[in-house]
Amino acid sequence: MMIRLIIHGCNGKMGKVVAKLAKENPEFEVVAGVDKNTFPLDFPVYSDLKEVKEEADVVIDFSYHEAIPNLVKEAAKRKIPVVIATTGLSEEELKTVEEASKEIPIFRSANMSLGINVLISLVKEAAKVLEGFDIEIVEKHHNMKKDAPSGTALMIADAINQVLPEKREYVYGRYTKTEQRKPNEIGIHAVRGGTIVGEHDVIFAGPNEVITISHSAQSREVFGYGALKAAKFLIGQKPGLYTMEDLVKKG
């Protein structure tokens, strides 16, 4: 069965990547796009999901966080599953997503790369063993990225905190710090420059040794492939919130 897609944010960098990959894959067909820039592509483009006339099986979103509430509300009305790859959502926006997930299956991940999710599994195991080590996360992205720290860096920090006996406090940069580092911290640092697609280093620093676990995305296509895998995963799922961990478990 061919999976019919609507790409929300189709004229953005990642939207175009997903459209290209879907066109090359016989399992998918892009039936429509949604974007504030309605420049026509190989499929009709609308300014709002409400305007879309085409029937679809899944919406893949690579847009901006302010657009998410309207997207999930309309998708819930239409009973269309949604893959959300947009980062930087506020608490209020996340609540709207959770509410919509009672009506439709929603897949949300701050990073659609399978590799970064392997990194998360590795750092969770490392955090269990290296319990007393200092932990620092350094993320690097291109100079057009607006949110800092990245959603992925926060996702990594949250995953580490899940397995520690006591949760650690997040410290964002140390620019105004004039005191010694506290042992109950996870330092999170953002670098922005050039065309860096995405790099994440997780540093475990202990007495006389340092372990660094790293992931580097070489192309935006890794996120596009992950989004298509997520779309396929959502077909037939019950309403609820799903993550890359669910996809990896399913294999």
From Swiss-Prot:
Enzyme class: oxidoreductase
Single GO MF descriptor: NADP binding
CC annotations in GO: cytosol
Catalytic activity reported: (S)-2,3,4,5-tetrahydrodipicolinate + NAD(+) + H2O = (2S,4S)-4-hydroxy-2,3,4,5-tetrahydrodipicolinate + NADH + H(+); (S)-2,3,4,5-tetrahydrodipicolinate + NADP(+) + H2O = (2S,4S)-4-hydroxy-2,3,4,5-tetrahydrodipicolinate + NADPH + H(+)
Active site: H141, K145
Any single Pfam family the record assigns to this protein: DapB_C
InterPro entries: DapB_C (IPR022663), DapB_N (IPR000846), DapB_N_CS (IPR022664), DHDPR_bac (IPR023940), NAD(P)-bd_dom_sf (IPR036291)
Pathway the protein contributes to: Amino-acid biosynthesis; L-lysine biosynthesis via DAP pathway; (S)-tetrahydrodipicolinate from L-aspartate: step 4/4
Protein EC: 1.17.1.8
Keywords tagged on the record: Amino-acid biosynthesis, Cytoplasm, Diaminopimelate biosynthesis, Lysine biosynthesis, NAD, NADP, Oxidoreductase
Binding, (S)-2,3,4,5-tetrahydrodipicolinate: H142, G151, T152
Protein's GO biological process: diaminopimelate biosynthetic process; lysine biosynthetic process via diaminopimelate
Binding residue positions for NAD(+): G9, C10, N11, G12, K13, M14, A85, T86, T87, S109, A110, N111, M112
CDD domains xrefs: DHDPR_N
Subcellular location: Cytoplasm
Cysteines paired by S-S bonds: none
Similarity annotation: Belongs to the DapB family.
Function according to Swiss-Prot or TrEMBL: Catalyzes the conversion of 4-hydroxy-tetrahydrodipicolinate (HTPA) to tetrahydrodipicolinate.
Protein name: 4-hydroxy-tetrahydrodipicolinate reductase
Top-level taxonomy: Bacteria, Bacillati, Bacillota, Clostridia, Thermoanaerobacterales
Gene: dapB
